[in-house]
Design a protein with these regions (language model features):
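A hydrophobic/aromatic-rich effector-binding and dimerization subdomain
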Residues: 1-8, 62-96
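A generic structural motif
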Residues: 35-37, 44, 60-62, 70-71
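Generic protein-terminus/edge-of-domain signal
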Residues: 1-50, 54, 88-95
Length: 96
């Protein structure tokens, strides 16, 4: 679901097997793996997350995902506009 007020996306992803090609967006993305696994490539670094793992993908960073077996994850995407508006002083804000 996407909040009309904040544009923050919070949803459960159930994936039977897919590939999302390299892309980027102006949102911080947090993925918490509940079941299965997910292969993630962030810029040139690839890794796999498993149940109980959580990863944060920064805004404006090229990334892709590949699901090779069924999985279930909780996904939170927080737009930079929201963070800049409601969090006045971000530590390391120039790095986001």
């Amino acid at each position: 679901d996407v909040s009309d007020i904040t544009n923050v996306r919070f949803y459960t992803s159930i994936d039977q097997g897919s590939y999302i090609p390299p892309h980027w967006h102006r949102a911080v993305e947090i993925i918490y793996m509940q079941e299965g696994s997910l292969d993630i490539t962030v810029e040139s670094r690839s890794f796999t997350i498993h149940p109980g793992d959580c990863t944060l993908i920064n805004a404006n960073v090229l990334h892709s995902t590949k699901c090779t077996n069924p999985n279930k994850a909780i996904v939170l995407q927080i737009p930079l506009d929201f963070m800049e508006k409601y969090i006045k002083s971000l530590p390391y804000g120039d790095k986001i």
